[in-house]
Swiss-Prot record:
Organism placement in taxonomy: Eukaryota, Fungi, Dikarya, Ascomycota, Saccharomycotina
Domain of life from the UniProt record: Eukaryota
Keyword Ion transport attached: yes
CDD domains attached to this UniProt entry: NOX_Duox_like_FAD_NADP
Binding site for NAD(+): V442, L443, N444, H445, F446, K447, N448, N449, F450
Side Cytoplasmic, residues: 1-35, 111-128, 179-186, 238-267, 424-686
Residues reported to bind FAD: H320, P321, F322, T323, I324, A325, S326
GO molecular function: ferric-chelate reductase (NADH) activity; ferric-chelate reductase activity; oxidoreductase activity, acting on metal ions
Recorded catalytic activity of this chain's protein: 2 a Fe(II)-siderophore + NAD(+) + H(+) = 2 a Fe(III)-siderophore + NADH
Organism of this sequence: Saccharomyces cerevisiae (strain ATCC 204508 / S288c)
Topology term for the membrane: Multi-pass membrane protein
Protein name from the UniProt record: Probable ferric reductase transmembrane component 8
Annotated gene: FRE8
Residues exposed to the Extracellular side: 57-89, 150-157, 208-216, 289-402
């Protein structure tokens, strides 16, 4: 087969405008496939997605998913090495492209004119599902509206692409038939060109760099253009699309009515924490919809004194989402806000909308009085006394261990969960990555049980959205046999443990590959950290202070972080470190700069590390409940008490949560996916 025959084959099989088809039947097929596309789209969004979210919570389905992710598609498999496996964006792109391509091409019989008409009609048919995905909160069960935004973005991209192709092919069809000038003078076609221009404007401003440059411009263009597109498409489409327009208007107006219903005005108090963080407070009674679960969020808008500006803010609700850092029963609602573009003025009025509940499937509020005699609680560490059961901190927790990673102001998501999970006897670890050690001052404004909290101070400059957590995805065959794990305890000493020691009696034993080897062969290190020499650490003094003067001076913070030469004084010696309140001395600053607080007090139970954490086998061992006490001579305690049972049954009670910057959430999600664990991420970044 030569090149000429290949070209001729394509010419014969490619769609063409020369196909002779009855105009009436062509119109019927275009309407038929667009309606089927609309119906199936709503079935996928309203039935299949919630059903999948529900099935993931069942033990049987979790075991299947765990086996596939942790064993079949582990790091040795070729599937794991592909970008498609890890990138949700690529998966959605492929699914949306195949889905729409089927309805565009199926049954067209090579008629390019019918395909062109279908592109326009299907892009209109996808508008109601596209707008439905933006509803806040989502009416779908077991579904957080933030989790639907990636699907919303890819459907919108497909709609824009089909609109462009629809316009281009129609212009070409008019040109070859010498009707371009005549057709383009008709008003409906002009409306179509204007709608395409608005689609392109939305696409350009939706690029990530444009969004980060000016989110306000992106939002205004997005909101106004959406309404205008609905109007222009209504008058452009032939035959009419009254039912599509009705659905679109109902969705948008319903969202407006609900937003106004849960919006109120409050007067806030601003408490400065550091140069980068502030605490916003207002009474719980001013919140229109009281929160039920911890980790919810609300949306805030400025209350303008000018009536016209207030009307405009209701017309185009440019709101900022913030996670509620206080627990639902507190009298004050507290928000930890990163100082930036959002203006913060104490004793001023703001519009507040919400609260919006999180989608944490393992936690719920008891709806009926708890009977002490029943065995509804599977947690053996839970105190079922009547006084604690009647506490506002009492929740039904369907998890035994919760591992959380947050970055920057994402600590708002972790603090209320940490307090409630600790109260209900759940083993919990909270890793907070922060750039500035002064942000630790925010902990003193919250009444909390900080057991299980670890703070990693990167000491680097930049935007909060650039905060990351490391997950090095590689496989070393030698590590399966003898893997040395380096970790830093609260006393600053380095403990090295091999994988074999976890299940041994003290004598070396040959290791056989097991179902946990894939993740337990990874190294858990603290990036850019060199443990200090013991001789360099002086004895702990009576003041029990932590001095960061040489660790994070302004002139050396970037250099020291890169070389891992951070230094501590009188803070990493003795097992009692971080078990009592600590006092941090800030680094020396330039005299010209504003004076910083003399000392920063850290609550008891908090562990502080330097650098950036790396997720690995030590963290997975913690999820498996196989971590060892480094100070215990005998390693008999390292045996997993229930090693005979199916470990997937236990891991179904383990959850991994992440909140904050996109990079941190993606790394945590990949680590949790490779381990076959439940994962929930929450990010307001678009």
């Amino acid at each position: 087969m030569n090149l000429k025959s290949i070209v001729s084959w394509f010419k014969e099989h490619l769609p063409s405008f020369d196909v002779d088809v009855d105009k009436h039947f062509r119109t019927l097929r275009v309407r038929k496939y667009s309606q089927i596309c609309l119906l199936i789209s709503f079935i996928i969004i309203c039935v299949i997605i919630p059903l999948m979210n529900y099935l993931l919570l069942t033990d049987k389905f979790f075991k299947i998913c765990h086996h596939l992710k942790h064993h079949v598609f582990n790091r040795r498999s070729w599937v794991h090495k592909t970008h498609m496996y890890h990138k949700q964006s690529l998966q959605l792109c492929l699914i949306c492209f195949v889905f729409t391509s089927f309805f565009v091409i199926q049954g067209a019989n090579g008629d390019l004119l019918e395909i062109t008409k279908r592109m326009g009609r299907i892009s209109v048919a996808l508008m109601p599902p596209l707008l439905f995905l933006t509803l806040r909160p989502s009416p779908l069960p077991h579904t957080l509206y933030l989790a639907l935004l990636p699907l919303h973005k890819w459907i919108s991209r497909i709609v824009v692409l089909e609109s462009i192709l629809h316009t281009w092919f129609y212009l070409y069809y008019m040109y070859i038939n010498d009707t371009l000038y005549v057709k383009m003078r008709k008003l409906p076609n002009i409306y179509g060109v204007i709608a395409l221009g608005l689609f392109l404007l939305i696409a350009i401003t939706s690029v990530r760099y444009a969004r980060r440059w000016s989110y306000r411009v992106f939002y205004y263009v997005h909101y106004v253009s959406t309404w205008l597109i609905l109007v222009f498409l209504h008058y452009h489409a032939r035959p009419g699309i009254s039912y599509y327009t009705t659905l679109n208007v109902l969705i948008l107006t319903g969202q407006i009515v609900y937003r106004l219903h849960i919006t109120n005005v409050t007067r806030v108090t601003i408490v400065p924490i550091s140069s980068s963080l502030s605490l916003l407070e207002f009474p719980l009674t001013d919140l229109p919809k009281k929160p039920i679960l911890p980790g919810g969020h609300l949306r805030i808008n400025i209350y303008h004194r000018n009536f016209l500006r207030r009307f405009f803010s209701h017309l185009i609700p440019f709101q900022h989402p913030f996670t509620i850092a206080s627990i639902p029963s507190d009298n004050l609602v507290r928000l930890i806000i990163r100082n930036g573009h959002f203006p913060l003025r104490t004793n001023e009025k703001y519009y507040i909308t919400g609260a919006f509940e999180p989608e944490l499937s393992f936690i719920s509020k008891p709806t009926v009085p708890f009977n002490i005699t029943t065995k509804s609680s599977k947690n053996p560490f839970r105190n079922n006394s009547s006084a604690l059961i009647n506490s506002p901190l009492n929740f039904l927790i369907k998890a035994q261990r919760v591992f959380m990673c947050v970055g920057g102001s994402g600590i708002s998501f972790g603090l209320p969960l940490l307090r409630i999970l600790n109260f209900n006897g759940v083993n919990v670890r909270l890793l907070w990555v922060s750039r500035d050690y002064k942000d630790l001052e925010v902990l003193n404004h919250f009444k909390n049980n900080f057991e299980g909290m670890e703070i990693y101070i990167s000491g680097t400059e930049g935007n909060e959205q650039d905060i990351e957590i490391d997950y090095i995805d590689y496989h070393d065959c030698a590590a399966d046999i003898n893997d040395e794990v380096r970790s830093i305890s609260s006393s600053g000493r380095v403990s090295e443990l091999g994988d074999n020691s976890m299940l041994s009696d003290g004598n070396p034993q040959p290791t056989e590959p097991n179902e946990n080897t894939a993740l337990l062969s990874k190294k858990s290190t603290l990036r850019n950290h060199h443990p200090p020499k013991t001789s360099d650490i002086p004895d702990i003094n009576a003041d029990d202070e932590i001095d960061f003067t040489y660790a994070f001076s302004r002139s050396k913070s970037r250099k020291n972080t890169a070389q891992g030469t951070l230094t501590t004084h009188s803070s990493f010696n003795g097992s009692s470190v971080f078990r009592q309140p600590k006092i941090i001395e800030p680094p020396a600053q330039d005299p010209c700069l504003e004076a910083a607080p003399k000392k920063i007090r850290i609550p008891a139970g908090v562990k502080v590390f330097f650098g950036r954490p790396t997720l690995g086998d030590k963290d997975y061992e913690w999820c498996l409940q196989t971590e060892c006490d480094a100070e215990t001579d005998s390693i008999q305690c390292c045996r997993w008490a229930n090693q005979g049972r199916d470990h997937a049954e236990y891991l179904s009670q383990v959850w991994v949560l992440a909140a904050g910057p996109r990079g941190l959430i993606e790394s945590t999600k990949r680590w949790a996916t490779d381990g076959g664990l439940h994962f929930h991420g929450e990010s307001f970044a678009l």
